[in-house]
A protein has these predicted regions:
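Glycoside hydrolase catalytic-domain context in secreted enzymes
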Residues: 1-250
Length: 250
C-alpha cells in the first residue's frame, strides 16, 4: 500500500506523498472541471453509457479533478425524467462515472463532484427550497439554515463534495432576470441569510461555493453579467457584507 492510500495517516501526509508521485500533467488534470456532467452520459431505460467526449477528456488529462452537474436536469441541461438521472438511479450512475475515472488515473485518484444549489438541489428528485428572494422575505435565517442542512444531507448521499450556492448577490434592479437568486435588496439581511445558508450546508461536510461575484446584482439596465457602474464605497457598503458573512461562516 502506498502512503497516500493509507487511511490511517493524516491528510497532510497522504497529500504530500501523492503530490510527490504526480506528473505535471496529472496535477493540471486535477484542476480540470471543464465538462458538464449532464453531457457525459446517455441513458436508455435504466442503463447508462459514457460519451466519448468524457472518456477522451479523462484519458487526455490522466484523470479528472472535478465534475460539474452530473445530476443536473432542467431545460438548460436538456435532461428530464426519461433522459436524466432520477434519484433511484443516481448511485448507479455515480459509481459508473467514478469507476471509469479511478481506473483511468495512473494513481487511482477519484474525482470530486460539484452541483448547482440555487435554492436546494437542482436535480431530479432533489429537495427544493423557496427561491432566495422568498426565503429572504421570511426574515428567518435559522429556518434557512435547517433547509440547507437537509439539502446538504441529500448532496452527501449522492457523493457531492461542493455545492454551488447563490448567496453573494444583492438585489439592486428588479429588471435583472436573476433577482430571485438574491436574498434581499438590504445588505444586512442578505448577509444574514447567506451566512445561514453556508453554515447549514457545511454542517453536513459538503463545501459551499458562494456565488456569483460581488456586485453582480448591480447590473447596468438589468442586463445579466453587465458592468457594475459603482464606486468603492457602494461596493464596500452594499455588496461586500454577504461575501464577508460567507467567509465568516467558513
Amino acid at each position: 500500500m502506498e502512503v497516500y492510500q493509507n487511511a490511517a495517516l493524516s491528510p497532510e501526509e497522504r497529500a504530500k506523498d501523492l503530490l510527490g508521485k504526480m506528473t505535471l500533467q496529472e496535477k493540471v488534470g486535477q484542476l480540470n472541471q471543464r465538462l458538464y456532467g449532464f453531457r457525459i452520459y446517455e441513458r436508455e431505460d435504466e442503463e447508462f453509457t459514457l460519451t466519448e467526449e468524457f472518456k477522451e477528456e479523462v484519458n487526455r488529462m490522466g484523470g479528472l479533478g472535478a465534475l460539474y452537474g452530473l445530476y443536473r436536469a432542467d431545460p438548460w441541461a436538456d435532461k428530464d425524467e426519461k433522459t436524466g438521472i432520477v434519484l433511484e438511479l443516481s448511485a448507479k450512475a455515480y459509481n459508473m462515472v467514478q469507476k471509469y475515472v479511478i481506473e483511468h488515473s495512473r494513481l487511482g485518484i477519484p474525482m470530486m463532484m460539484s452541483t448547482e444549489c440555487p435554492h436546494g438541489h437542482q436535480a431530479l428528485g432533489g429537495g427544493l427550497l423557496p427561491v432566495n428572494l422568498a426565503a429572504g422575505a421570511t426574515f428567518d435565517p435559522e429556518l434557512l439554515l435547517e433547509g440547507y442542512r437537509a439539502c446538504g444531507k441529500q448532496l452527501k448521499s449522492g457523493h457531492v463534495e461542493l455545492a454551488l450556492m447563490s448567496a453573494l448577490d444583492v438585489a439592486r434592479d428588479p429588471r435583472w432576470g436573476r433577482s430571485e437568486e438574491c436574498y434581499s435588496e438590504d445588505p444586512c439581511l442578505a448577509a444574514a441569510m447567506a451566512k445561514a445558508a453556508v453554515t447549514g450546508m457545511q454542517s453536513t461536510g459538503v463545501g459551499s461555493v458562494a456565488k456569483h461575484f460581488c456586485a453582480q446584482g448591480e447590473t447596468t439596465g438589468g442586463v445579466n453579467a453587465s458592468a457594475a457602474r459603482i464606486g468603492e464605497r457602494e461596493l464596500r457598503e452594499i455588496h461586500f457584507p454577504p461575501a464577508k458573512a460567507c467567509c465568516e461562516a467558513g
